[in-house]
């Protein structure tokens, strides 16, 4: 199993079960760190099992990475999946074509935009509307005009990426 995928799935299940957002973010950060390594660095850390020597990788995330690197499904992921309850509404969920109200970690949501769009694609959604807060809602980290422009650039890049996936 790919360690990045394992870490992101663990973050998803922790987020879904409303666990401590700091722990959720730790798994997302660890996924970003591993994803940022080139193949040679991954191989080097994998052979030496030295994941924890990387800044931002703690004992729990290192264990997940090691287990995934060795081809195992990480224990933490198995445990979270088995504890996950059915959210219900499967029939309605299957009929949904998209989502028109999404908050990312740019405001008061907990997931990065790219993960949200990847999940939407996996669910078969045809469209999504990102509805992060405006600057007036400072308590929710509303987007200033500058941050909104940056976010639109991110969205444009993802639009290109997911349009290629859909073709």
Task: Give a label for each model feature.
Residues 1-92:
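Long, highly charged, low-complexity intrinsically disordered interaction regions
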Residues 75, 79-167:
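An N-terminally biased module of ancient metal coordination in phosphate/nucleic-acid-related enzymes
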